[in-house]
C-alpha cells in the first residue's frame, strides 16, 4: 500500500470534477462563510439569531457555502422531519438577508430534490477540502485489524460489529448524548438503545474505545487519530445513508484501505473510484465484513 501512496493522492485530487468551480468562487470573492445545512434547521427551530455574524446582519454582500449533512436532512428512515425544518430555515434566512448568496454543496446531485429552487447548487465533495498534512503514513506497529471512526448514531450501524469474531477492532466515537456530541433532536429511546449497544460492545474484549479514559469521553487530536489509523490494517464505513464521509479520506491519506457497506448519499460513488484502495457495496452481513478485514490484513 505504501508503494502506491502517491498514486492514491493523485486519485484523490482528480475525484472531484467540480473543484475548480468551487475554488474559482473562493478566489474571486472576498467575503465568504461556511456552514452546514443543520445551521438553518437550528435557525428555524431555536432562532439562533445571536450566532449570525454582524457583517451578515448589516446585509453586506457575501456568499454562504452550506454543506456537510445534506443527505441527513433529507427525509429518510432516521429523520423524517429534518428536511422540512431545514428548508423553512433557509427560506426565512434568505428573505431576511437578501444580499446573501447561499450555495448548497452536495456530493450526490440526487439530494438537491426538494430544496428551494431560488438557491444555487454545486455538486461538490467537501472531502476535497481536507487538510492533507494532518493525515499521512507513519511507521507504527499494527495493533488493530480494523478501525471504525464514527459518531454513535443509528445510521452508522455499529450493530454490524457485534458478532465479529477473531478480529481486534478499534473504535473512535462520541455517544450522541455525550458532552462532546449533544443533539437535542435525538429521541430518548434512541439514546437508551445506543447506550445498551455501547455497553455490549465494550464488554467484548475484541473492541477498544480509543477516546475514552476513566469512563469519560476525551477529545482526540488529529495527530493522535492519525497514529491510531496507522496502527490499523483497514478503516470501516458501515453507514447505510451518508454523504461525503470525511473519515473515508482520512483513512486513505493515512494509508488505510476502506471497507464500505452499501450506501446511499455519495460515499459509494467516491470510493468506487479508489480501485484497490476500497472494497464497496458489501451487504449488511458480518461474514462479508470479516472477509474484507482479512483480505486487507493479508
PLM region spans:
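Conserved catalytic-core segment of nucleotide-activated headgroup transferases in glycan assembly
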Residues: 45-46, 73-91, 98, 107-114, ...
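Short acidic alpha-helix that forms the nucleotide-activated donor recognition element
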Residues: 217-232, 253
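Short alpha-helical segment that forms part of, or immediately flanks, the ligand-binding pocket
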Residues: 226, 248-253, 267-268
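Short hydrophobic beta-strand element within catalytic cores of glycosyltransferases
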Residues: 257-261
